[in-house]
Protein backbone atom coordinates (compact mmCIF):
# COMPACT_ATOMS: atom_id res chain seq x y z
CA UNK A 1 0.00 0.00 0.00
CA UNK A 2 2.82 2.39 0.87
CA UNK A 3 4.45 1.75 -2.50
CA UNK A 4 1.17 2.46 -4.32
CA UNK A 5 0.71 5.69 -2.40
CA UNK A 6 4.30 6.68 -3.16
CA UNK A 7 3.84 6.17 -6.89
CA UNK A 8 0.53 8.00 -6.83
CA UNK A 9 2.12 10.96 -5.06
CA UNK A 10 5.02 10.95 -7.51
CA UNK A 11 2.66 11.07 -10.50
CA UNK A 12 0.70 13.92 -8.95
CA UNK A 13 3.89 15.88 -8.35
CA UNK A 14 4.96 15.35 -11.97
CA UNK A 15 1.50 16.30 -13.22
CA UNK A 16 1.61 19.47 -11.12
CA UNK A 17 5.04 20.39 -12.49
CA UNK A 18 3.93 19.81 -16.07
CA UNK A 19 0.82 21.95 -15.54
CA UNK A 20 2.89 24.75 -14.00
CA UNK A 21 5.42 24.69 -16.84
CA UNK A 22 2.61 24.76 -19.39
CA UNK A 23 1.06 27.74 -17.60
CA UNK A 24 4.40 29.56 -17.46
CA UNK A 25 4.94 28.88 -21.17
CA UNK A 26 1.58 30.47 -21.98
CA UNK A 27 2.69 33.59 -20.10
CA UNK A 28 6.31 33.79 -21.21
CA UNK A 29 5.96 32.86 -24.90
CA UNK A 30 3.96 35.99 -25.93
CA UNK A 31 6.49 38.15 -24.09
CA UNK A 32 9.39 36.49 -25.92
CA UNK A 33 7.58 36.96 -29.23
CA UNK A 34 7.13 40.69 -28.57
CA UNK A 35 10.83 41.04 -27.75
CA UNK A 36 11.77 39.04 -30.87
CA UNK A 37 9.57 41.20 -33.13
CA UNK A 38 11.23 44.34 -31.75
CA UNK A 39 14.64 43.05 -32.92
CA UNK A 40 13.58 41.84 -36.40
CA UNK A 41 14.36 43.73 -39.57
CA UNK A 42 11.29 45.34 -41.11
CA UNK A 43 7.84 45.41 -39.58
CA UNK A 44 6.65 41.81 -39.68
CA UNK A 45 4.51 40.10 -37.07
CA UNK A 46 5.52 36.59 -38.12
CA UNK A 47 8.92 34.95 -37.99
CA UNK A 48 11.21 32.87 -35.82
CA UNK A 49 11.61 33.42 -32.11
CA UNK A 50 15.30 34.16 -32.67
CA UNK A 51 15.72 36.76 -35.48
CA UNK A 52 18.05 35.74 -38.30
CA UNK A 53 19.51 39.24 -38.59
CA UNK A 54 18.88 41.10 -35.33
CA UNK A 55 18.44 44.84 -35.76
CA UNK A 56 18.17 47.79 -33.38
CA UNK A 57 16.29 50.01 -35.83
CA UNK A 58 12.97 49.74 -33.99
CA UNK A 59 14.59 50.49 -30.65
CA UNK A 60 16.41 53.50 -32.07
CA UNK A 61 13.15 54.89 -33.44
CA UNK A 62 11.36 54.21 -30.15
CA UNK A 63 14.12 56.00 -28.22
CA UNK A 64 13.93 59.03 -30.51
CA UNK A 65 16.92 58.41 -32.81
CA UNK A 66 16.82 58.54 -36.60
CA UNK A 67 17.78 55.44 -38.60
CA UNK A 68 19.96 55.56 -41.73
CA UNK A 69 18.82 53.01 -44.30
CA UNK A 70 21.01 51.03 -46.72
CA UNK A 71 20.16 53.42 -49.58
CA UNK A 72 21.31 56.41 -47.56
CA UNK A 73 17.85 57.70 -46.73
CA UNK A 74 17.09 58.67 -43.15
CA UNK A 75 13.99 57.52 -41.29
CA UNK A 76 13.04 59.88 -38.45
CA UNK A 77 11.17 58.64 -35.37
CA UNK A 78 7.49 58.43 -36.42
CA UNK A 79 6.13 59.20 -32.95
CA UNK A 80 7.36 60.74 -29.66
CA UNK A 81 7.49 57.45 -27.73
CA UNK A 82 9.60 58.77 -24.84
CA UNK A 83 7.18 61.68 -24.41
CA UNK A 84 4.31 59.19 -24.26
CA UNK A 85 6.24 57.07 -21.76
CA UNK A 86 6.86 60.10 -19.53
CA UNK A 87 3.18 61.05 -19.77
CA UNK A 88 2.21 57.54 -18.68
CA UNK A 89 4.60 57.56 -15.72
CA UNK A 90 3.53 61.05 -14.67
CA UNK A 91 -0.21 60.38 -14.90
CA UNK A 92 0.07 56.94 -13.30
CA UNK A 93 2.33 58.14 -10.48
CA UNK A 94 0.22 61.16 -9.52
CA UNK A 95 -3.03 59.20 -9.86
CA UNK A 96 -1.75 56.34 -7.71
CA UNK A 97 -0.56 58.68 -4.96
CA UNK A 98 -3.90 60.50 -4.90
CA UNK A 99 -5.84 57.21 -4.97
CA UNK A 100 -3.84 55.90 -2.00
CA UNK A 101 -4.45 59.15 -0.08
CA UNK A 102 -8.19 59.29 -0.79
CA UNK A 103 -8.75 55.56 -0.32
CA UNK A 104 -6.85 55.48 2.97
CA UNK A 105 -8.74 58.34 4.58
CA UNK A 106 -12.09 57.05 3.29
CA UNK A 107 -11.35 53.51 4.45
CA UNK A 108 -10.39 54.81 7.90
CA UNK A 109 -13.75 56.56 8.20
CA UNK A 110 -15.65 53.42 7.21
CA UNK A 111 -13.55 51.15 9.43
CA UNK A 112 -13.37 53.23 12.61
CA UNK A 113 -16.15 55.83 12.65
CA UNK A 114 -19.84 55.31 13.24
CA UNK A 115 -22.30 57.31 11.18
CA UNK A 116 -25.73 56.83 9.70
CA UNK A 117 -25.90 55.17 6.30
CA UNK A 118 -22.36 53.76 6.39
CA UNK A 119 -23.30 50.29 5.14
CA UNK A 120 -25.59 51.73 2.46
CA UNK A 121 -22.83 53.98 1.14
CA UNK A 122 -20.36 51.10 1.06
CA UNK A 123 -22.74 48.88 -0.89
CA UNK A 124 -23.63 51.70 -3.29
CA UNK A 125 -19.95 52.38 -3.96
CA UNK A 126 -19.33 48.75 -4.81
CA UNK A 127 -22.41 48.51 -7.05
CA UNK A 128 -21.41 51.60 -9.05
CA UNK A 129 -17.85 50.26 -9.34
CA UNK A 130 -19.18 47.13 -11.06
CA UNK A 131 -20.26 49.12 -14.12
CA UNK A 132 -17.42 49.50 -16.67
CA UNK A 133 -16.12 53.00 -17.36
CA UNK A 134 -16.98 52.56 -21.06
CA UNK A 135 -20.66 53.04 -20.21
CA UNK A 136 -19.90 56.55 -18.95
CA UNK A 137 -17.68 57.75 -21.81
CA UNK A 138 -20.25 60.14 -23.29
CA UNK A 139 -21.04 61.57 -19.86
CA UNK A 140 -17.33 61.94 -19.07
CA UNK A 141 -16.70 63.83 -22.29
CA UNK A 142 -19.58 66.23 -21.64
CA UNK A 143 -18.55 66.67 -18.00
CA UNK A 144 -14.92 67.51 -18.71
CA UNK A 145 -15.83 69.68 -21.68
CA UNK A 146 -17.95 71.80 -19.33
CA UNK A 147 -15.47 71.62 -16.45
CA UNK A 148 -12.67 72.89 -18.70
CA UNK A 149 -14.57 76.12 -19.28
CA UNK A 150 -14.25 76.98 -15.58
CA UNK A 151 -11.06 75.12 -14.61
CA UNK A 152 -8.89 74.85 -17.75
CA UNK A 153 -6.32 72.42 -16.32
CA UNK A 154 -9.11 69.91 -15.58
CA UNK A 155 -10.73 70.08 -19.02
CA UNK A 156 -10.39 68.04 -22.18
CA UNK A 157 -6.91 67.25 -23.52
CA UNK A 158 -5.26 67.83 -20.13
CA UNK A 159 -3.48 65.39 -17.89
CA UNK A 160 -5.16 67.04 -14.92
CA UNK A 161 -8.57 66.12 -16.29
CA UNK A 162 -7.44 62.56 -17.00
CA UNK A 163 -6.09 62.15 -13.47
CA UNK A 164 -9.30 63.58 -12.03
CA UNK A 165 -11.37 61.09 -14.02
CA UNK A 166 -9.35 58.16 -12.66
CA UNK A 167 -10.01 59.21 -9.07
CA UNK A 168 -13.61 58.10 -9.45
CA UNK A 169 -12.58 54.45 -9.38
CA UNK A 170 -11.47 54.16 -5.76
CA UNK A 171 -14.38 52.10 -4.38
CA UNK A 172 -12.58 48.76 -4.67
CA UNK A 173 -9.46 50.20 -3.04
CA UNK A 174 -11.54 51.64 -0.19
CA UNK A 175 -13.01 48.20 0.45
CA UNK A 176 -9.56 46.59 0.35
CA UNK A 177 -7.94 49.04 2.77
CA UNK A 178 -11.00 48.98 5.03
CA UNK A 179 -10.66 45.20 5.35
CA UNK A 180 -7.01 45.63 6.32
CA UNK A 181 -7.76 48.33 8.89
CA UNK A 182 -10.30 46.04 10.53
CA UNK A 183 -7.56 43.47 11.18
CA UNK A 184 -5.65 46.01 13.31
CA UNK A 185 -6.66 46.07 16.96
CA UNK A 186 -8.37 49.28 18.12
CA UNK A 187 -6.43 49.10 21.38
CA UNK A 188 -3.34 50.47 19.66
CA UNK A 189 -5.13 53.70 18.78
CA UNK A 190 -6.79 53.81 22.20
CA UNK A 191 -3.38 53.55 23.85
CA UNK A 192 -2.11 56.39 21.68
CA UNK A 193 -5.14 58.48 22.69
CA UNK A 194 -4.37 57.85 26.37
CA UNK A 195 -0.87 59.17 25.74
CA UNK A 196 -2.39 62.39 24.43
CA UNK A 197 -2.43 61.71 20.70
CA UNK A 198 -5.19 63.28 18.63
CA UNK A 199 -7.20 61.06 16.24
CA UNK A 200 -5.15 62.40 13.33
CA UNK A 201 -1.88 61.63 15.13
CA UNK A 202 -3.08 58.12 15.99
CA UNK A 203 -4.03 57.58 12.36
CA UNK A 204 -0.77 58.97 11.00
CA UNK A 205 1.70 57.60 13.55
CA UNK A 206 0.08 54.29 14.53
CA UNK A 207 -2.28 53.03 11.85
CA UNK A 208 -0.47 54.13 8.69
CA UNK A 209 2.93 52.54 9.54
CA UNK A 210 1.15 49.24 10.17
CA UNK A 211 -0.71 49.55 6.86
CA UNK A 212 2.27 49.96 4.52
CA UNK A 213 1.77 46.49 2.89
CA UNK A 214 -1.81 47.17 1.78
CA UNK A 215 -0.97 50.73 0.71
CA UNK A 216 1.83 49.34 -1.48
CA UNK A 217 -0.62 46.88 -3.03
CA UNK A 218 -3.15 49.62 -3.78
CA UNK A 219 -0.42 51.81 -5.28
CA UNK A 220 0.83 49.01 -7.55
CA UNK A 221 -2.65 48.00 -8.70
CA UNK A 222 -3.55 51.63 -9.40
CA UNK A 223 -0.30 52.24 -11.25
CA UNK A 224 -0.73 49.16 -13.45
CA UNK A 225 -4.35 50.02 -14.18
CA UNK A 226 -3.58 53.59 -15.25
CA UNK A 227 -0.56 52.69 -17.39
CA UNK A 228 -2.62 50.22 -19.41
CA UNK A 229 -5.89 52.17 -19.54
CA UNK A 230 -7.05 53.17 -23.04
CA UNK A 231 -10.78 54.05 -23.41
CA UNK A 232 -10.94 57.06 -21.07
CA UNK A 233 -7.47 58.35 -22.02
CA UNK A 234 -8.20 58.13 -25.75
CA UNK A 235 -11.47 60.00 -25.19
CA UNK A 236 -10.07 62.88 -23.13
CA UNK A 237 -6.70 63.32 -24.89
CA UNK A 238 -6.58 64.60 -28.47
CA UNK A 239 -3.09 66.11 -28.84
CA UNK A 240 -0.47 63.57 -29.96
CA UNK A 241 2.10 65.01 -27.56
CA UNK A 242 -0.34 64.57 -24.66
CA UNK A 243 -1.00 60.87 -25.30
CA UNK A 244 -0.09 58.24 -22.78
CA UNK A 245 1.90 55.33 -24.20
CA UNK A 246 -1.07 52.95 -24.19
CA UNK A 247 -3.05 55.38 -26.35
CA UNK A 248 -0.15 56.42 -28.57
CA UNK A 249 0.82 52.86 -29.43
CA UNK A 250 -2.39 52.54 -31.42
CA UNK A 251 -0.88 54.94 -33.95
CA UNK A 252 1.43 52.13 -35.08
CA UNK A 253 -1.43 49.88 -36.14
CA UNK A 254 -3.42 51.79 -38.73
CA UNK A 255 -4.93 49.49 -41.42
CA UNK A 256 -2.60 50.84 -44.10
CA UNK A 257 0.49 51.00 -41.90
CA UNK A 258 1.14 48.14 -39.48
CA UNK A 259 4.48 48.99 -37.85
CA UNK A 260 4.77 45.79 -35.83
CA UNK A 261 8.46 46.17 -35.00
CA UNK A 262 8.06 49.73 -33.71
CA UNK A 263 4.92 48.69 -31.84
CA UNK A 264 6.77 45.81 -30.16
CA UNK A 265 9.63 48.06 -29.02
CA UNK A 266 7.16 50.55 -27.56
CA UNK A 267 5.28 47.70 -25.86
CA UNK A 268 8.44 46.51 -24.13
CA UNK A 269 9.17 50.08 -23.01
CA UNK A 270 5.66 50.35 -21.56
CA UNK A 271 6.39 47.40 -19.28
CA UNK A 272 9.48 48.99 -17.74
CA UNK A 273 7.72 51.40 -15.31
CA UNK A 274 5.41 48.64 -14.07
CA UNK A 275 8.35 46.27 -13.59
CA UNK A 276 10.38 48.86 -11.68
CA UNK A 277 7.47 49.76 -9.39
CA UNK A 278 6.73 46.08 -8.76
CA UNK A 279 10.37 45.29 -7.91
CA UNK A 280 10.56 48.20 -5.49
CA UNK A 281 7.38 47.18 -3.65
CA UNK A 282 7.39 43.38 -4.00
CA UNK A 283 8.34 42.70 -0.36
CA UNK A 284 4.99 44.16 0.73
CA UNK A 285 2.91 42.70 -2.06
CA UNK A 286 2.19 39.17 -0.79
CA UNK A 287 1.43 40.22 2.78
CA UNK A 288 -0.79 43.07 1.63
CA UNK A 289 -2.79 40.93 -0.79
CA UNK A 290 -3.49 38.23 1.79
CA UNK A 291 -4.26 40.53 4.71
CA UNK A 292 -6.40 42.94 2.72
CA UNK A 293 -9.11 40.35 2.25
CA UNK A 294 -9.32 39.33 5.93
CA UNK A 295 -11.91 40.92 8.12
CA UNK A 296 -11.28 40.87 11.86
Curated annotation (Swiss-Prot):
<keyword id="KW-0813">Transport</keyword>
<feature type="topological domain" description="Periplasmic">
    <location>
        <begin position="144"/>
        <end position="152"/>
    </location>
</feature>
<dbReference type="InterPro" id="IPR000515">
    <property type="entry name" value="MetI-like"/>
</dbReference>
<keyword id="KW-0472">Membrane</keyword>
<dbReference type="Pfam" id="PF00528">
    <property type="entry name" value="BPD_transp_1"/>
</dbReference>
<feature type="topological domain" description="Periplasmic">
    <location>
        <begin position="36"/>
        <end position="88"/>
    </location>
</feature>
<feature type="transmembrane region" description="Helical">
    <location>
        <begin position="89"/>
        <end position="111"/>
    </location>
</feature>
<keyword id="KW-0812">Transmembrane</keyword>
<keyword id="KW-0997">Cell inner membrane</keyword>
<feature type="transmembrane region" description="Helical">
    <location>
        <begin position="13"/>
        <end position="35"/>
    </location>
</feature>
<comment type="function">
    <text>Part of the ABC transporter complex MalEFGK involved in maltose/maltodextrin import. Probably responsible for the translocation of the substrate across the membrane.</text>
</comment>
<keyword id="KW-0762">Sugar transport</keyword>
<feature type="transmembrane region" description="Helical">
    <location>
        <begin position="205"/>
        <end position="227"/>
    </location>
</feature>
<dbReference type="GO" id="GO:0042956">
    <property type="term" value="P:maltodextrin transmembrane transport"/>
</dbReference>
<dbReference type="InterPro" id="IPR050901">
    <property type="entry name" value="BP-dep_ABC_trans_perm"/>
</dbReference>
<protein>
    <recommendedName>
        <fullName>Maltose/maltodextrin transport system permease protein MalG</fullName>
    </recommendedName>
</protein>
<feature type="topological domain" description="Cytoplasmic">
    <location>
        <begin position="112"/>
        <end position="123"/>
    </location>
</feature>
<feature type="transmembrane region" description="Helical">
    <location>
        <begin position="153"/>
        <end position="175"/>
    </location>
</feature>
<feature type="topological domain" description="Cytoplasmic">
    <location>
        <begin position="281"/>
        <end position="296"/>
    </location>
</feature>
<keyword id="KW-1003">Cell membrane</keyword>
<dbReference type="GO" id="GO:0005886">
    <property type="term" value="C:plasma membrane"/>
</dbReference>
<keyword id="KW-1133">Transmembrane helix</keyword>
<comment type="similarity">
    <text>Belongs to the binding-protein-dependent transport system permease family. MalFG subfamily.</text>
</comment>
<feature type="transmembrane region" description="Helical">
    <location>
        <begin position="124"/>
        <end position="143"/>
    </location>
</feature>
<feature type="topological domain" description="Cytoplasmic">
    <location>
        <begin position="1"/>
        <end position="12"/>
    </location>
</feature>
<dbReference type="InterPro" id="IPR035906">
    <property type="entry name" value="MetI-like_sf"/>
</dbReference>
<feature type="topological domain" description="Cytoplasmic">
    <location>
        <begin position="176"/>
        <end position="204"/>
    </location>
</feature>
<feature type="transmembrane region" description="Helical">
    <location>
        <begin position="258"/>
        <end position="280"/>
    </location>
</feature>
<dbReference type="GO" id="GO:0015423">
    <property type="term" value="F:ABC-type maltose transporter activity"/>
</dbReference>
<comment type="subunit">
    <text>The complex is composed of two ATP-binding proteins (MalK), two transmembrane proteins (MalG and MalF) and a solute-binding protein (MalE).</text>
</comment>
<feature type="topological domain" description="Periplasmic">
    <location>
        <begin position="228"/>
        <end position="257"/>
    </location>
</feature>
<feature type="domain" description="ABC transmembrane type-1">
    <location>
        <begin position="85"/>
        <end position="281"/>
    </location>
</feature>
